[in-house]
Amino acid sequence: MACTEFSFHVPSLEELAEVLQKGLKDNFAHVQVSVVDCPDLTKEPFTFPVKGICGQTRIAEVGGVPYLLPLVNKKKVYDLNEIAKEIKLPGAFILGAGAGPFQTLGFNSEFMPIVQTASEHHQPVNGSYFARANPADGKCLLEKYSQKYPDFGCALLANLFASEGQPGKVIEVQAKKRTGEHNFVSCMRQTLEKHYGDKPVGMGGTFLVQKGKVKAHIMPAEFSSCSLNSDEAVNQWLNFYEMKAPLVCLPVFVSKDPGLDLRLEHTHFFSHHGEGGHYHYDTTPDTVEYLGYFSPAQFLYRIDQPKETHAFGRD
């Protein structure tokens, strides 16, 4: 697979915390950003296979929306253990947002990769989830992937944050009561873009929606047989939902595209009450509460970039 490597601008955690504190204040009534020790992510509500998101951090964007839209390209299937090798970090802990491995599932779905990949020292562990619209009633059906399937596949497109999965210092972001127009991730990403300009900064990690509800979507199980050539057509195809806290979210975002046709932000989420999908924004600005832990990425790996591209279907 073709792979392009790019070095991000990596400010200190203290500087990033200061920048995010100022930017988030324009969008939330209560904001507290600080540098802390990463909480133990093996514990609830995260239940990840590793304790942290630190060590040799990188972002990988694999494939892209043009492999899904306007019509699906079913040749575009991937393996997360192989992706870990591509990004020069076998054994990496990978989290993020992507399309479910239809090659195994037999249908299309939203995918929440949470994987400690294989290395010489340990077997891989798959903590991933997938969400689909229940064929019976159209409601969300969230399942843990490894309870049914032994592989480490994904497909079409994925935005991934990878690390050694180590404990360490991270940026903690608390934000309550949204007063602005932007969602939590967009606000952070745009704050970084405004401050750092042409020096791209990449970040990933996890955040909780502790209170409130969010607008989400789940792709249909059947790929579209007719061309979807606009955001309007895509939105008519998608299934939209309102889902309630507590939600565990897996954000990946980049402040500015260095010319690699990136999806600048992409967040999927799961929960322990059967809801999961693609995060758009909260629908309860007065009561919403976010708590997140983030780490800056050192490198970007653009894997299997589509040669023919377009700008729709990336919300």
Curated annotation (Swiss-Prot):
SMART domains: DUF1907
Cofactor(s) listed in the protein's UniProt record: Zn(2+)
EC number(s) from the headed UniProt entry: 3.1.-.-
Protein name, entry field: Ester hydrolase C11orf54 homolog
Top-level lineage group: Eukaryota
Its job: Exhibits ester hydrolase activity on the substrate p-nitrophenyl acetate, in vitro. Regulates DNA damage and repair by regulating HIF1A degradation via chaperone-mediated autophagy (CMA).
Entries under InterPro entries matching the protein: C11orf54_DUF1907
Annotated Pfam families: DUF1907 (PF08925)
Positions contributing to Zn(2+) binding: 266, 268, 278
Annotated GO CC locations: cytoplasm; nuclear body; nucleus
Subunit text: Monomer.
Enzyme class: hydrolase
Gene Ontology molecular-function annotations: hydrolase activity, acting on ester bonds; zinc ion binding
Main location: nucleus
GO process terms (BP): DNA damage response; regulation of DNA repair
